[in-house]
Amino acid sequence: MDPLNATGMDAFTAIHLNASWSADSGYSLAAIASIAALVSFLILFTVVGNILVVIAVLTSRALKAPQNLFLVSLATADILVATLVMPFSLANELMGYWYFGKVWCGIYLALDVLFCTSSIVHLCAISLDRYWSVTQAVEYNLKRTPKRVKCIIVIVWLISAFISSPPLLSIDSNNYISSQPQCMLNDDTWYILSSSMASFFAPCLIMILVYIRIYQVAKTRTRSMSGKEPRPDGVTQTENGLNKANSPCHGDRENGHCQCPPTPSQRTVTIGQQTDDADMDESFSSEGKGHKPQRQDSQRAKRPGLKKSSISKQSARISRVSNKSVDLFASRRKRRRSSIAEKKVSQAREKRFTFVLAVVMGVFVVCWFPFFFSYSLHAVCRDYCKIPDTLFKFFWIGYCNSSLNPAIYTIFNRDFRRAFQKILCKSWKKSF
């Protein structure tokens, strides 16, 4: 009888079954209790952390970018690992045999391969998305709509399902001959090598090569931008953002001042002056341009009131035109500065996102490489090299990876950190 159905049995029988269970698994009762507690905490942490990731992306404005849907799908895969794979792996590990039947064994193995493959294919798709966003920034950002990202996610899951389908057809039936059946993948060399290559090594190689290329492109752009930043000696920037060296003074100097080409606002004022002069029958002249005939002076002397009112009207018109020009120039400069600031914020966010994903990919490779390496080594030299059975426990390190992504987002990304704090504070306030 299974220990799980020990309800109503006397204490002696329960202790006896626990002792036999301990003997089958090779663990002591204390070790079984410790492992069960540790893995249970890992499952809970994985589920809660990845649910927070999903809620954060779907509710936070700072995380509304379409590419973050990849993280939602990746978090979903990690949640499914924690709920549909890890509990049965824990039971199989502690009991020492597979209790749940042959049919569920095939489904369990297929789901295990599916979610592992899905995680790395997601990371591969994310690396390609990063590469295209870096090399084809304008064109690709216009194409990268939520609908397009969702289509890519569906393709990722279909590829993962295709790779993970063989376990349903290739379960080793010899594992069920003994009284204590084992749930293991097909042990044939061809299957081990092909599944390892398709599920891990090939996507991992693509991912690493793409990120190396992203690093090279980013480094080249940084060098080119740093080469453009230095200004020539003697060049200063005026308040309106124009370089003095780019607007040289020319012509003769008058009264110690240099005659420079008029700025747009100055041109507008000049036009207003010309219009007013025409309205006043050219009664005014610029300073230093000579004198009009004496007859005009006598006419102006006869009309002092007209002269004062005309001067005030002209000054008002010039002031209005000048103010409009200054306001227009200031608004354009403000819009230009705001667009530049938005662009810098967007670029900084893209850089942070790329760095975080690089950390996620690196941690994934570190967690899963030991298992796939030992698994493939067993297929290649099973007759010549003895691999300890403990090496096949490395898949637990791979399972731990499912719980690490939320922690990585929290540590390395400010937007995720703020979103998590907001979600937790809201739930904390609602609970009181």
Curated annotation (Swiss-Prot):
Disulfide cysteine pairs (residue numbers): C105-C183
InterPro entries the record matches: ADR_fam (IPR002233), ADRA2C_rcpt (IPR000735), GPCR_Rhodpsn (IPR000276), GPCR_Rhodpsn_7TM (IPR017452)
Subcellular location: Cell membrane
A cellular-component GO term for this protein: plasma membrane
Membrane topology qualifier: Multi-pass membrane protein
GO terms, biological process: platelet activation; regulation of smooth muscle contraction; regulation of vasoconstriction
Chain ranges on the Extracellular side, renumbered to this chain: 1-32, 96-105, 173-188, 381-393
Cytoplasmic domain ranges by topology: 58-69, 129-149, 213-356, 414-432
Glycan-bearing residues: N5, N18
Free-text function comment from the UniProt entry: Alpha-2 adrenergic receptors mediate the catecholamine-induced inhibition of adenylate cyclase through the action of G proteins.
Similarity annotation: Belongs to the G-protein coupled receptor 1 family.
Name of the molecule in the record: Alpha-2 adrenergic receptor
Native species: Labrus ossifagus (Cuckoo wrasse)
Taxonomic classification: Eukaryota, Metazoa, Chordata, Craniata, Vertebrata
